[in-house]
Amino acid sequence: MVGGGAKRRLRGEGPQCEKPVDMKKSKSCEADVPGDLRKEVESHYRLPLPEDFYHFWRFCEGLDPEQPADSLSASLGLRLVGPYDILAGKHKIKKKSASLNFNLHWRFYYDPPEFQTIIIGDSKTQFHMGYFRDSPDELPVFVGTNEAKKNCIIVQSGDNVFAAVKLFLMKKLKEVTDKKKSSLLKTIDEKLTEAARELGFSLEQRTVRMKQRDKKVVTKTFHGAGLVVPVDKNDVGYRELPETDASLRRICGTIVEAPSDADRLQAFAPVQEMMTYVQFANDECDYGMGLELGLDLFCHGSHYFHKVAGQLLPLAYNLLKRNLFAEIIEAHLANRSQDDVDQLAA
């Protein structure tokens, strides 16, 4: 039978602005963005957004007051999208924006419900950055990047958007040979670094808060960003899958490459067996097991796993009281596209 889950440390949420002062509700920490605009963004997405989201918008307004969303296009090839489209008023131009599902807006093929795109880059690789939350009622735990045309891997890039863009910029700076371009990047880097320092945002790729989260990760999952679920002192909350990641990948490969439907059905047997284990796990409140299997099958990407992922994931999210994530995965699986991700496109 399957084993118990990994131990979990106490949950610790760090302040959003890491300044050496009491940060309970420091006004200096709050970006100058109108309250009604904040409400509009958060009501469309039904997700809380961290203060760095708004501060970065103000920073981009400083670079280009007319087109803040495109202020990094010429220099870095980056564009602010997703919830930033609401700050830019783009949703007001679209006639039927009221009926749009914003949680599918810029949701790329491999983006799990935990991931919310805020910046896009090279369209050839579908590079994008997004906030990653473990639960829809919590603030993001880090900013991740993914290249959807390549794979499902989510790379952790700091715990705020300033850090993620800084890391991207530093990489770009190493690749640039043109002096003029290099000079432009250095100027932006100076402004970005100064703004982050003034606001108290860490520019580290892996902050203390992110390392604290690592201790709570029960399993890495195929996307590599890790899975965090509540596990009590008796180890209830998660149990391991009976297959390693490598063997699960092999099983998935055998299913996808099966020469006939009969062979495919046969190759599905280990997955069916794991689904039975998940039912036992759910009965005993180890909800993390079904979530892990569902996410792994979703991240594998083949349409052959959409039905199974559609059975496992909404149930797991609802059992974990992450109901919005259940809604997102159902909508995404029903409209999973490799290209049409801009919901506001005409």
UniProtKB/Swiss-Prot annotation:
Domain of life: Eukaryota
PTM annotation (N-acetylmethionine): residues: 1
Any one GO BP annotation for this protein: DNA damage response
ADP-ribosylserine sites (modified residues): 97
Localization terms from the record: Chromosome; Nucleus
Annotated GO MF terms: chromatin binding; histone binding; poly-ADP-D-ribose binding; protein ADP-ribosyltransferase-substrate adaptor activity
Biased composition (Basic and acidic residues): 19-29
UniProt keyword DNA repair, yes or no: yes
Record-linked Pfam families: HPF1
Chief location of this protein within or outside the cell: nucleus
Known partners and oligomeric status: Interacts with PARP1 (via the PARP catalytic domain). Interacts with PARP2 (via the PARP catalytic domain). Interacts with core nucleosomes in a PARP1- and PARP2-dependent manner.
Protein family per UniProt: Belongs to the HPF1 family.
Protein name: Histone PARylation factor 1
Species the sequence originates in: Bos taurus
Organismal lineage: Eukaryota, Metazoa, Chordata, Craniata, Vertebrata
